[in-house]
Amino acid sequence: TTGKDIYREELVGGQSARLLCGYIYASAGDGESTQDVVYSAHNIIAENGRILKKAKRFANETVYSEIDVLRLNAERRRMTTFETRMDGYTEIPFALKIEETELTRYIDPMPFVPGSKTDRERRCDEILSIQAMGLKKRLEHTHCRSAVIGISGGLDSTLALLVTVRAFDLLGMDHKNIKAVTMPGFGTTDRTYDNAVSLIKCLNADFMEVSIRDAVNIHFRDIGQDPKVHDVTYENGQARERTQILMDIANKTGGMVIGTGDLSELALGWATYNGDHMSMYAVNASVPKTLVRHLVRYYADTCGDKELEAVLLDVLDTPVSPELLPPEDGKISQKTEDLVGPYELHDFYLYHMLRLGYAPAKIYRLAKIAFAGTYEDETILKWLKTFYRRFFAQQFKRSCLPDGPKVGSVAVSPRGDLRMPSDACVKLWREQLDRL
């Protein structure tokens, strides 16, 4: 009957979601009796609420796809509905030759980002609301009179400031109680500095500027660090000086330091321990870098302020960098993705490892399909090895994270989402990677 196909797809998809299973539906077709009804040969393959393949009705098509059993197992482990039952079945040994077949299903290279514009905009608005509501509650609970946030002109601090502004609007508080601090250092470029200043002024926050150069040079002198040696001490000394400044301003103004670091940075440990790693409430802690871009873009598209939109678009166009090393010819010399790898790859690895529990070999296979034509296989494997090495080695930073709102199904909070020992060994994962 007319309209039955839509209902059938919803029914099959819904049932596969309810049971966390694969569902294969095969309808009768050409050749069946048409005395009272006509069969449409509507064939459907669904997995956990998602229609993988469906046949065109009345075409007698054969459809095929792959059902990811490991994914279904991972989903069922997360649900208390499905108990572990070790009895009640019989094992029957048999021989089966296992061959690797070509995967035909779509592998999303951006698992954190909805594909359709409508879904993406709805998700962005929801995430901004979750972040803002989380901060609103924390400000109310602590009776803080201000929020203190370091603004670098980069993506993460920009998003954190936008969230803070939304939280203040919910509270009916003056934006001047947002102490937005720019702290120029040895690696600050004119582009990021100008964007930071413009952003703060567009949002009517209280602009503050505290240069860290003199304080860091004095600190280097005190500890015997040669400022011409651009090592980890040179970089981390700047990050910790900035955090000290923000903490002290917060104490002085009865405020709270708002953390800016995102989920991708936390996964890689790309943060200075007790530097930008530390805050009083970390609003971006469960937002991956690939999603941060879309959140800032969504704000730019919907803010209704041309000047603010222009600033946000230039922030989006700026290379991701901690700006801890001196610039070259006035431009950013230290680009994060050149050092640790593309964030779109790392977010893909992170999602499939934490959300679905996949092993390195499977993640590598899926990544080769998802990023075919974008990255060479050798590049994908190189950064996958980097991801595992850093993820395990940097757990000690995640073991003492500040509070922050969870916005999605993947998070690394040590208080519930990732109860992982800081001295966990990566050996088993590296051995599998070395065999690829």
Residue ranges: model-predicted function:
Residues 3, 17-21, 30-34, 41, ...:
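ATP/NTP-dependent adenylation/nucleotidyl-transfer catalytic domains that generate, transfer
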Residues 6-13:
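Charged helix-capping and loop-helix junction motifs
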